[in-house]
C-alpha cells in the first residue's frame, strides 16, 4: 500500500486487530521510507441491496438516511453514538445477508424499529409514530402496551 505522506510503495503492518464487532480489521502501518504511521481499515465488500419504496421506485440503500432517521428518534436520549453506529452496521449486515439485490422499504423500517426497541423504548415509540403513521392517541397507547408485554 502506498504511503499517504510520501507516496512510497513500501509500507509494513505494525499492528492488526478486529474492529466493528469483528466485521473489519484495523491495521497500523508504517512507511519504510519516511517512517510515518497511519491506520487502514479492511472489510469485506458486500453489495447492499436496493430499496423498493412503497411507490415502486428503487433507490440505493443509504446508511446516512438511516442514520438521520434513527438519530432523530434518539434525539436527547441516553444512547451513545457508538451504540447508534453498531445498530446501523447491524441493520446493513442484515440487509446484505438477505442475499437479495432488492428489499422492500418495509424490511428496512422493521429492522430499524427492532434496533430502536433494543436501544431505547422512547426512541422506538417516536420512530413508530412516524413510520406507522399514528393518527391518534389510541395508536400510541396500543404500541406502548405491546412494549410492556
From Swiss-Prot:
Any single biological process term in GO: negative regulation of DNA-templated transcription
Keyword Transcription in record: yes
Cofactor details (free text): Binds 1 zinc ion.
Keywords tagged on the record: ATP-binding, DNA-binding, Metal-binding, Nucleotide-binding, Repressor, Transcription, Transcription regulation, Zinc, Zinc-finger
Essential cofactor(s): Zn(2+)
Pfam families per record: ATP-cone (PF03477), Zn_ribbon_NrdR (PF22811)
unnamed ZnF: 3-34
PROSITE patterns associated with the record: ATP_CONE (PS51161)
Coiled-coil portions: none
Example of a GO MF term: ATP binding
Keyword Phosphoprotein: no
Domain ATP-cone: from-to ranges: 49-139
Its job: Negatively regulates transcription of bacterial ribonucleotide reductase nrd genes and operons by binding to NrdR-boxes.
Family assignment from sequence similarity: Belongs to the NrdR family.
Xref: HAMAP family: NrdR (MF_00440)
Listed name of the protein: Transcriptional repressor NrdR
Organism listed in the record: Actinobacillus pleuropneumoniae serotype 3 (strain JL03)
Organism placement in taxonomy: Bacteria, Pseudomonadati, Pseudomonadota, Gammaproteobacteria, Pasteurellales
Name of the gene this protein is made from: nrdR
